Amino acid sequence: WVYAVFHRPIDAFCADGVGRWLKILFFCGVGVFCLLLGFVAVIGYAGAATGQEKAIVVLGAGLRKDVPSDLLRRRLDAAYAYYLENPEVVIAVTGGQGNGETIPEGVAMARYLEEKGVPEEQIVVEQKSTSTEENLLFAKELLEERGIGADEPMAVVTNAFHCYRARCYARLVGFEQVSSIPASIGLNSVLPCYMREVFAVLYYWVFKTSQSGWISPLVGIL
């Protein structure tokens, strides 16, 4: 609506000189953003779980007091569906206690799965993490205590938009055989979640790849 109201002065400014170059930069930026948006949308479905995983790690996504948010419920349902087909798998649920939450996310996630029928002894509860990286790092430590090493196949359970970056972080913290289980997402959350994820992926490429020696933005595809 801004352009509709001020289109004449904007067109005049962009006709030549600095304005023209700013217009070019703007449209180039929009083009790059759209390419990255498409990359994130497609790549979330790569690296799918094979059914051979020894453990799956469900990443936290917020609570409403002590009830899983819609995003988190979808992740837990995806984990439960995998469990039904692979009943021997160990499920690590991860997440600390954030603002407005009355219990740690990991505790609420374990309760949700137990109510569905997953045995308590097959659930590993992590309840201190505050980020995706910590989710996976702390889960790795707890799984190792259970005798599941970082060299054994595992899968990250998260919403599709988040799968690529989650696989990258899993490898960053030391997991060697990483796949993912993409959960669905509500239609009202698609655009904001994918747009936000573009910037999160850029942050990872700029600030995290140097920690592992990775230089390719394609890390995490396989």
Q: What residues fall within each predicted segment?
A:
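Short hydrophobic alpha-helical membrane-anchoring segments
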Residues: 4, 32-41, 205, 209
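Membrane-interface helix-boundary motifs at transmembrane edges
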Residues: 9-21
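Internal/C-terminal transmembrane anchor helices
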Residues: 18-40
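The feature marks non-catalytic terminal segments
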Residues: 213-222
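A structural signal for short, hydrophobic/glycine-enriched beta-strand patches
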Residues: 37-196
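A transmembrane-helix-recognition feature enriched in membrane-embedded lipid enzymes
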Residues: 190-214
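Membrane-embedded alpha-helical segments of integral membrane proteins
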Residues: 1-11, 222
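Residue-level signal for protein termini and structural transition zones
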Residues: 16, 29, 46-48
